[in-house]
Regions:
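Multi-pass alpha-helical membrane architecture of UbiA-family
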Residues: 1-240
């Protein structure tokens, strides 16, 4: 009598692969915050300090407030708040961008809307907190309101003003001009004395001229963008 033998075959299970993260996730974040625009803001502010103010410190009565560390904080705060503004702008612009520039849409594709909101809040909090510290550092705690107002206005612009004829263009152009004026506010105003006030105001007026020029250039740019984006804006119900 033959014994029945059971032959067992063991089949190795294929290893489960860990889902790969999107290789361009970091690049997507950089595109979301529009790093080239942020770099331009930082460059302009650095030029104001080191090419406009610093050369005249020894030859005029010009006095500035911030050392390299303090000025670095001002630049960092500016680009953080601007980055937050760019993020919230992209979040609200998804529908129109899918029509006007579908290849450049980041939110909802390479970055989720939830992640975008987290980044928006993070950049805003960091930028405003640095502004709070910096305002107290120069002994002008009231300057903190500037950062809060800019942050709030960027949100209102993205969620409401951008959909309104010309009003949105004016608002964002004012914010662009403020990225220039804020250097004068923190560098010149806190150290005004009766001896140097003429010089301080002369340089502040010079900055004001630059800011007005930036306002006008950005207004033209925004109007041209509205003309280019008319199809997407119309389909989204925007009165631009």
């Amino acid at each position: 009598m033959t014994d029945d033998k059971t032959i067992r075959v063991f089949v190795a299970k294929p290893k489960q692969q860990t889902p790969k993260q999107h290789p361009t996730h970091t690049l997507s974040i950089l595109n979301l915050i529009r790093w080239k625009n942020l770099l331009m803001i930082a460059l302009v502010q650095l030029l104001i300090k080191y090419a406009l103010f610093e050369p005249f410190l020894k030859t005029t009565e010009l006095t500035i407030t911030l050392n390299a560390f303090g000025f670095g904080l001002l630049v960092l705060s500016s680009i953080c708040i601007a980055a937050a503004g760019n993020i919230i702008n992209d979040i609200y612009d998804v529908e129109t961008d899918l029509v006007n520039r579908p290849s450049k849409v980041v939110v909802g594709k390479s970055i989720s809307e939830k992640t975008a909101y987290i980044l928006f809040i993070t950049f805003n909090v960091v930028g405003v907190l640095i502004g709070f510290y910096l305002s107290n550092l120069v002994g002008r705690s009231g300057f903190f309101a500037i950062f809060v107002i800019i942050s709030a206005l960027l949100y209102v612009y993205a969620s409401y003003l951008k959909q309104t004829l010309l009003l949105g263009n004016i608002a964002i152009s004012i914010l662009v001009a403020m990225s220039i004026l804020i250097v004068g506010v923190f560098e010149l105003i806190p150290v005004i004395t009766s001896q140097n006030q003429t010089t301080q105001f002369t340089f502040f007026k010079l900055l004001l001229d630059y800011a007005i020029f930036a306002f006008l250039i950005n207004m033209v740019r925004e109007i041209i963008k509205d003309i280019e984006d008319v199809d997407g804006d119309y389909k989204s119900g925007m009165n631009t």
